[in-house]
Amino acid sequence: MTEAAALIILAGALVIGLGAIGAAIGVALLGGKFLEGAARQPELLPMLRTQFFVVMGLVDAIPMIGVGIGMYILFALGA
């Protein structure tokens, strides 16, 4: 394996791994703020829950895009 091929594999792994770590941190912060808001104003719980799930879905879409780009890097460029 050449050095360039090894760096391409490393780049693909970093895209997938760091995207997943970033999304996990984002969902954790989002969940904490959701619980704070729900505890502070329980009457707003339905609105907060809807916004929470919409934003959580958007945050979770980022690692899926990263997986697609990482797989492209690994299989299309790494071959």
UniProtKB/Swiss-Prot annotation:
Protein location: Cell inner membrane
Record keywords: ATP synthesis, Cell inner membrane, Cell membrane, CF(0), Hydrogen ion transport, Ion transport, Lipid-binding, Membrane, Transmembrane, Transmembrane helix, Transport
InterPro entries named in the record: ATP_synth_csu_bac/chlpt, ATP_synth_F0_csu, ATP_synth_F0_csu_DDCD_BS, ATP_synth_F0_csu_sf, ATPase_proteolipid_c-like_dom, F/V-ATP_Csub_sf
Top-level division of the source organism's lineage: Bacteria
Pfam families according to UniProt: ATP-synt_C (PF00137)
Primary location class: membrane
This protein's record includes keyword Cell wall biogenesis/degradation: no
Site entry: Reversibly protonated during proton transport: D60
GO molecular function, one term: proton-transporting ATP synthase activity, rotational mechanism
UniProt KW rRNA processing keyword: no
Annotated coiled-coil segments of the chain: none
Extent of the signal sequence: none
Entry's family note: Belongs to the ATPase C chain family.
Complex formation: F-type ATPases have 2 components, F(1) - the catalytic core - and F(0) - the membrane proton channel. F(1) has five subunits: alpha(3), beta(3), gamma(1), delta(1), epsilon(1). F(0) has three main subunits: a(1), b(2) and c(10-14). The alpha and beta chains form an alternating ring which encloses part of the gamma chain. F(1) is attached to F(0) by a central stalk formed by the gamma and epsilon chains, while a peripheral stalk is formed by the delta and b chains.
Function: F(1)F(0) ATP synthase produces ATP from ADP in the presence of a proton or sodium gradient. F-type ATPases consist of two structural domains, F(1) containing the extramembraneous catalytic core and F(0) containing the membrane proton channel, linked together by a central stalk and a peripheral stalk. During catalysis, ATP synthesis in the catalytic domain of F(1) is coupled via a rotary mechanism of the central stalk subunits to proton translocation.
Record's protein name: ATP synthase subunit c
Protein source organism: Cellvibrio japonicus (strain Ueda107)
Organism lineage string: Bacteria, Pseudomonadati, Pseudomonadota, Gammaproteobacteria, Cellvibrionales
Name of the encoding gene: atpE
